Amino acid sequence: MASKEMFEDTVEERVINEEYKIWKKNTPFLYDLVMTHALQWPSLTVQWLPEVTKPEGKDYALHWLVLGTHTSDEQNHLVVARVHIPNDDAQFDASHCDSDKGEFGGFGSVTGKIECEIKINHEGEVNRARYMPQNPHIIATKTPSSDVLVFDYTKHPAKPDPSGECNPDLRLRGHQKEGYGLSWNSNLSGHLLSASDDHTVCLWDINAGPKEGKIVDAKAIFTGHSAVVEDVAWHLLHESLFGSVADDQKLMIWDTRSNTTSKPSHLVDAHTAEVNCLSFNPYSEFILATGSADKTVALWDLRNLKLKLHTFESHKDEIFQVHWSPHNETILASSGTDRRLNVWDLSKIGEEQSAEDAEDGPPELLFIHGGHTAKISDFSWNPNEPWVICSVSEDNIMQIWQMAENIYNDEESDVTTSELEGQGS
């Protein structure tokens, strides 16, 4: 039996490598930017910070990322990294690529540098890290324990204490187990939600300050789910509304003004398998999306949750991340176990397709990023550079990329499919 499994693994590995080679050959046609960077350890989390600096007379801008580590029994860190992203006028040429390193060059002086700027000791791997919108120096993290940690990275040395001691500014208590979901309220400073394997969602107000030492107890614990709560998200326009999704296949909408924490305002059987993630649309107060182990992304309208608006189908395995674009109301991306990051355009739902196009996926599937050869752990849309995404996968690879403008601008591409498929063969 073992040999059969080994054989299947080898075949899969071969297929993955083959697909990667084809992807790499086609990058000049498909992307305006691709930067591939091997991290020292895999990161389970990634988020762009909102800050951007444009150095005088340089052909790049500086951006920052929040990352974490997932080591093999070595010291873990919360990481802030600095990234050089070439300006539009710095000619990026994806065809200049060093095939051994998987590095893409061709920016003139910029080689798409990525440097670790701050490393802070962390207790165990960083399951997820998210900055507080009202003060991006403040970062909350999910740990392998039940504690949620809060760090103000300006109060920590750039190089971690060699003792390995983890010294968070606050320690948030209320969960019994670890988890992944984490969401800061963009309308109420300091209000943080966390989802856990203990079937609950905790809410803290970090402004309340610690009761003793650095410990802050949960302000409320929401107990509606009957299984692991995978993700939680505040509504972006209503300060008291949030959503949670869980392995009980349900999406729940909660209102913190309600006098009960055991029953949500709305409950919907969202998928036919575990629901792993959700995201509220930043432009439309009624629209949200959920992603599931049933390999689909579902679109919902808060005014009528009984009816699923749309199902996005193309992923071949579980979906773990879904995020709306910060710049375009109709653009959404999803990723997960199938090593693909799909970008969807709601405005194309129902468009007519040729039989040939239909084979590639539904009309609303705008783009498939195929650069990862392992499961994608997380991704983040750059808030300052439209269409730039950073994605991280389980094999230590981080990619910063932007699809070619002709793909999202609806202009007829001058690249024929035969050129793409047959290139170099």
UniProtKB/Swiss-Prot annotation:
Location relative to the cell: Nucleus
Gene Ontology molecular function, alphabetical: histone binding; RNA binding
Keyword annotations: Acetylation, Chaperone, Chromatin regulator, DNA replication, Isopeptide bond, Nucleus, Phosphoprotein, Repeat, Repressor, Transcription, Transcription regulation, Ubl conjugation, WD repeat
Gene Ontology biological process: brain development; cellular heat acclimation; chromatin remodeling; DNA replication; negative regulation of cell growth; negative regulation of cell migration; negative regulation of DNA-templated transcription; negative regulation of stem cell population maintenance
Pfam families to which the protein is assigned, alphabetical: CAF1C_H4-bd, WD40
Per UniProt, location of the Glycyl lysine isopeptide (Lys-Gly) (interchain with G-Cter in ubiquitin) cross-link in this chain: K4
PTM-bearing positions, type Phosphothreonine: T10
Residues that bear Phosphoserine: S3, S95, S354
Role of this protein: Core histone-binding subunit that may target chromatin remodeling factors, histone acetyltransferases and histone deacetylases to their histone substrates in a manner that is regulated by nucleosomal DNA. Component of several complexes which regulate chromatin metabolism.
Protein family per UniProt: Belongs to the WD repeat RBAP46/RBAP48/MSI1 family.
PANTHER family reported in the protein's UniProt record: WD40 REPEAT FAMILY
Pathological association: Spermatogenic failure, X-linked, 9: A male infertility disorder characterized by spermatogenesis maturation arrest and non-obstructive azoospermia.
Protein name: Histone-binding protein RBBP7
Organism for this UniProt entry: Homo sapiens
Name of the encoding gene: RBBP7
